[in-house]
Amino acid sequence: MGDFLNLFTEDVVEVFLWTDESFPVYFEYELSPLDYELPIIIPNYNGKFYGWQPWHYEGDRRTRHATSTLGGEKLSGGIVSGWRAEFFIPYKLLVPLNQVPPVSGTKWRVNMYRIDYDNATTHFAWQKISKSFHEYNNFGTFIFE
């Protein structure tokens, strides 16, 4: 596994940022326990997904991220009791989307997920979904002040 691969097939944390409800395109960020990342923009037309990776993903357009494990080594397939992730997504990376950067009063639709494949697959979501993480109409709302 590595950066820009199908991280969602393993343990991962994800955030979805839908910055403009009038346009079905949103940003998805995934981070694995091994600190691999997948930043993509998703045009979602009636459940058909077309992921686009960032171009010129460097400098102040690049995310910053880190992970750590609890109770074991940070290894692929390693036995751990848990893991932590932190990341910073710069507005400059989101510039192709509308309402970026946000101003006071701006509303973005957002959802966050954690997928755990250790034993039985377990999904955790900030806002409930029925079938797919890409149900952007079910995302919660961030209001910027």
Language-model-detected regions and their locations in the chain:
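Structural preference for beta-rich elements and adjacent junctions enriched in aromatics
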Residues: 1-145
